Regions:
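Acidic, carboxylate-rich catalytic segments that either coordinate divalent cations
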Residues: 371, 379-380
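Active-site/acyl-donor-binding loops of N-acyltransferases
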Residues: 65-67, 134-166, 254, 302-364, ...
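A conserved beta-strand-loop-helix scaffold within acyl/acetyltransferase catalytic domains
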Residues: 2-80, 126-155, 159-284, 382-394
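Acyl-donor binding region in acyl/amide transferases
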Residues: 45-46, 52, 67-150, 268-326, ...
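Low-complexity, flexible helical/coil segments
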Residues: 39-42, 84-88, 95-100, 157-163, ...
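Short, surface-exposed, polar/charged, turn-prone segments marking secondary-structure boundaries
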Residues: 78, 89-91, 150-154, 183-186, ...
Length: 394
């Protein structure tokens, strides 16, 4: 077995055929990975670990070297920001087939990279609870230079009804009347002006991005530095997935203006939800729920049978999801003074965050506090639907 690292875009071409054969998620898509490495200023280079056996790649760890700000959060607050070089292994970034031997040797290889000074830390973003790498990283910890015990989050999926009619199959009867009333109220408030548009073909990507930006600019995600933004990266991402026929966008237009949106990507038969936003003036009509119902009906018509809600838990995911698993982000820190300092800071802030969450959960006001913080972070006079947050590192 041989393990090495690719650190240039040119070298990536040597494993491209294997990568594209194994890719199964928008996050680990080769073309998108390459695009992000080219566009994001914080990305110093690719850092892809290649595991070979008998001269052929057996597996890949898709990562990037990033000059970033190490900023462990307490809730939505990031009290410290420390410049650091981090090797970020993407969510769903483990490609190919790995056995126990390959996993153990790969973990040792990653520690050797840290000892050599390649990075101050390595981040495995949201490893699944059944990942062999998670088990190996937990078993072969290196004392002070591993992160605290796992902080789990729940990842949800949903099976779509084959015959459509999402509201009939997934919404309880006592809620259907209320949802239909909200829809009638919306139509009454804007008679003849409401249009729901499902888009799977795109002729004007820049124009579409500009229209979405009118809504996204007022969303709370913008205050967090997440969510959709009309920039070169999103335009090229839309062009990439739209050109393949994988991009889907649900729009609510009123009098020709976009007032709400939700988009995602169909990838190997699974729809991956991405970003959403809506005009806060429409909050009383629960347009997030109305969009979600239409989106699922349109997907069912196309033959899509699985919807992936993406990273993180939320009330609507628990309400509609029918399959879930746990995930956690794992950090390894370089055996240096800086690595130790980063580890200690993460341990302290994680302990404060955990204590605060436990207190808030016992009081029973966690959801209310989340909503309040999101509204506070949103630009003045606006917010996005607090029950529909979407963030995912790619």
């Amino acid at each position: 077995m041989k393990i090495g690292t690719i650190k240039t875009l040119e070298e990536l071409e040597a494993v491209r055929a294997y990568w594209e054969r194994w890719q199964d998620h928008p996050n680990n898509d080769f073309a998108q990975f390459k695009m992000v490495c080219q566009l994001r200023p914080e990305v110093e280079s690719p850092c892809v670990v290649v595991i070979e056996r008998n001269g052929q790649p057996q597996a890949l760890l898709a990562g990037r070297l990033e000059k970033t700000q190490f900023a462990p959060p307490i809730g939505y607050i990031k009290p410290v920001r420390i410049p650091a070089k981090v090797m970020a292994v993407l969510h769903e970034g483990i490609l190919g087939q790995v056995d126990d031997e390959a996993v153990l040797e790969s973990v040792e290889y990653l520690w050797s990279l840290l000892r050599s000074g390649v990075a101050d830390a390595i981040e495995f973003h949201h490893l699944s609870e059944d990942s062999p790498f998670l088990n190996a990283l937990q078993l072969h910890r290196s004392g002070w230079f591993c992160d605290p015990p796992p902080r789990w989050s729940v990842h949800w999926e949903m099976t779509l009804p084959a015959e459509g009619a999402f509201i009939e199959h997934k919404v309880r009867s006592k809620h259907r009347t209320g949802i239909r009333k909200k829809e009638r109220d919306l139509e009454s408030a804007f008679p003849g002006k409401v249009s729901w548009r499902w888009m799977n073909r795109f002729d004007d990507i820049p124009g579409m991005c500009a229209r979405l930006e009118e809504v996204a600019a007022r969303a709370y995600q913008r205050g967090l530095g997440t969510g959709f933004m009309d920039n070169e990266e999103y335009r090229r991402r839309f062009a990439l997935f739209g050109g393949r026929g994988q991009l889907r966008i649900q729009l609510l237009e009123i009098d020709g203006r976009v007032r709400a949106f939700w988009f995602g990507y169909v990838y190997q038969g699974v729809f991956h939800l991405s970003e959403t936003g809506y005009d806060p003036e429409l909050s009383k009509y629960e347009v997030g729920t109305l969009m979600f119902i239409r989106l699922n009906d349109e997907l069912a018509k196309e033959g899509v049978r699985t919807l992936d809600f993406g990273i993180g838990d939320a009330l609507y995911k628990r309400r509609f999801g029918d399959r879930s698993w746990q995930e956690t982000t794992v950090w390894l820190f370089a055996p240096t003074a800086k690595g130790l300092a980063l580890r200690l800071i993460m341990g302290l802030l994680s302990a404060v965050d955990k204590f605060g969450r436990n207190v808030i959960q016992r009081i029973g006001i966690l959801d209310q506090l989340k909503t309040g913080w999101r509204r506070r972070l949103a630009p003045r006079k606006s917010s996005a639907d607090p029950e529909y947050p979407m963030t995912e590192k790619i």
